[in-house]
């Protein structure tokens, strides 16, 4: 893995973590709507 690949890999991991955090915050709202 060269430096560019490493940077892209790290950016993707950060984006995935951010998406997981946003999904957790949205989860209760989605559940309320379903109920």
From Swiss-Prot:
Residue segments, region Disordered: 1-35
Name of the protein in question: Putative uncharacterized protein DDB_G0294382
Low complexity bias locations: 1-27
Protein species of origin: Dictyostelium discoideum
């Amino acid at each position: 893995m060269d430096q560019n690949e490493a940077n892209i890999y790290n950016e993707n991991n950060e984006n995935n973590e951010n998406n997981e955090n946003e999904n957790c915050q949205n989860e209760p709202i989605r559940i309320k709507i379903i109920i």
